[in-house]
């Protein structure tokens, strides 16, 4: 990938220390191949989706190929049932470059039966020579703080996106030029400017074959106008106006804010599935659940002291696992984790993420899903049940147990009919 050096502006959040922010009824246990997950209740993989005729869209960059396979069917919680533990692993600016991290983590996801969300930067499908097709809000045409791509980088990224979706993963957006700060950054954009940015992100996905001259490549197997339902803003800036724009455009969730580990709620009709404050082992403060934030609090640079690489990676892994444990053994709030395909500090954070996936996704009653699947499950629940779940503080299970806490028959729930709790289709 021929992108320029990625500049990630930072904001701040006060905990015990200032933590800098990155620029960036049940879906319960799936029928994993991992032996450690045996005993998870009721999850079965459905038969593969029937093959559908491919219907090209536009210039053939995308196509309708039928419903996405491999997704868990959401089921409403039964009275007194303990919620499953959801974990979402997500990636900002997803693209395949010489590091081959996109393809690597697709393999990791398959190994541990974890589907993820890949937030694509639209300019990664736009070649340098066509840069002027991008007209960013409050900047001149052809400007991008993360550069553009070359033909091989576009080809490689498209192939990974295609395979990722076919594996059951989600393709969201990280928008385009990644502008942060006070000089035309996304935090200064109006609702209409956000709509323009979203429209252009869609356009680059829907026209990469023409723009990159890759007519021989197979299309992306989805209609991006329907696939795109959520995003994370650059540097976690500009969320207020973005959510307003996204609500008008039919998005279903946003993950650009800062939350504690409690059950999510909606904001202007969108699920707020933001990153969360998690422990930093050995320190008296918490930081955001993202590789960049651990890096800032450890080395403050992407090229720190090599003698500390292993310790820093272990610290991030252990912090994420501690966050998982307090949810899993507590209020069961979904754990939201964000990352970048980067080799900061010798790649120690990529190791940390992989080891976290291997640790948590194989546990009983745990489902590692994309944001889309989490939103589907939340939408399937009784609103009163979700309201009760939101009363549980970080790490706190119901005092008298789940059976008593959620004993009330949810409105519209089936009577005594036994319902399968999760199915893959």
Features from the language model and the residues they span:
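Secretory targeting and sorting signals
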Residues: 1-30
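C-terminal region of N-terminal signal peptides and the immediate post-cleavage residues
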Residues: 20-43, 47
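Active-site-adjacent pocket scaffolds in enzyme catalytic domains
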Residues: 46-62, 135-151, 217-331, 382-390, ...
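Active-site beta->alpha N-cap acidic-glycine motif
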Residues: 55-170, 177-181, 211-244, 260-261, ...
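C-terminal domain-boundary segment and adjacent tail
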Residues: 61-66, 70-71, 253-265, 320-425
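Generic structural signal for well-ordered alpha-helices
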Residues: 102-106, 157-162, 194-205, 243, ...
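Aromatic- and acid-rich polysaccharide-binding/catalytic face
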Residues: 169, 173-174, 273-276
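Active-site cleft segment of glycoside hydrolase catalytic domains centered on the general acid/base Glu
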Residues: 182-200
């Amino acid at each position: 990938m021929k992108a320029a050096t990625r500049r990630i502006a930072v904001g701040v959040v006060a905990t015990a220390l200032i933590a800098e922010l990155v620029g960036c009824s049940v879906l319960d246990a799936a029928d994993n191949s991992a032996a450690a997950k045996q005993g998870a209740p009721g999850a079965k993989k459905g038969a593969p989706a029937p093959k559908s005729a491919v219907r090209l869209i536009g210039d053939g960059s995308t196509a309708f190929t039928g419903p996405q396979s491999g997704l868990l069917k959401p089921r409403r919680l039964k009275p007194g049932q303990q919620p499953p533990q959801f974990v979402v692993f997500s990636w900002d600016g997803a693209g395949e470059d010489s590091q081959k991290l996109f393809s690597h983590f697709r393999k990791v996801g398959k190994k541990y039966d974890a589907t993820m969300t890949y937030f694509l930067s639209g300019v990664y499908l736009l070649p340098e020579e066509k840069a002027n097709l991008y007209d960013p809000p409050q900047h001149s045409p052809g400007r991008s703080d993360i550069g553009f791509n070359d033909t091989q980088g576009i080809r490689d990224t498209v192939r990974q996106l295609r395979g990722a979706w076919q594996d059951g993963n989600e393709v969201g957006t990280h928008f385009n030029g990644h502008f942060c700060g006070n000089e035309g950054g996304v935090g200064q954009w109006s609702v209409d400017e956000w709509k323009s940015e979203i429209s252009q992100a869609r356009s680059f996905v829907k026209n990469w074959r023409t723009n990159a001259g890759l007519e021989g490549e197979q299309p992306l197997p989805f209609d991006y106008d329907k696939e795109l339902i959520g995003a994370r803003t650059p540097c976690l800036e500009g969320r207020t106006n973005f959510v307003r724009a996204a609500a008008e455009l039919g998005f279903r969730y946003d993950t650009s804010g800062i939350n504690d580990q409690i059950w999510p709620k909606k904001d202007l009709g969108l699920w707020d599935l933001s990153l969360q404050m998690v422990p930093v082992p050995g320190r008296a403060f918490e930081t955001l659940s993202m590789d960049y934030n651990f890096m800032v609090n450890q080395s403050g640079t992407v090229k720190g002291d090599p003698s500390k690489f292993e310790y820093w990676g272990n610290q991030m892994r252990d912090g994420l696992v501690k966050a998982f444990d307090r949810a899993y053994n507590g209020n069961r709030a979904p754990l939201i984790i964000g990352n970048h395909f980067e080799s900061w500090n010798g790649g120690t954070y990529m190791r940390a993420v992989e080891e976290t996936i291997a640790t948590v996704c194989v546990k009983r009653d745990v489902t590692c899903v994309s944001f889309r699947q989490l939103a589907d499950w939340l939408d399937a629940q009784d609103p009163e049940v979700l309201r009760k779940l939101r009363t549980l503080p970080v790490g706190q299970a119901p005092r008298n147990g789940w059976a008593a806490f959620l004993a009330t028959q949810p409105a519209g729930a089936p009577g005594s009919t036994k319902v399968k709790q999760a199915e893959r289709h």
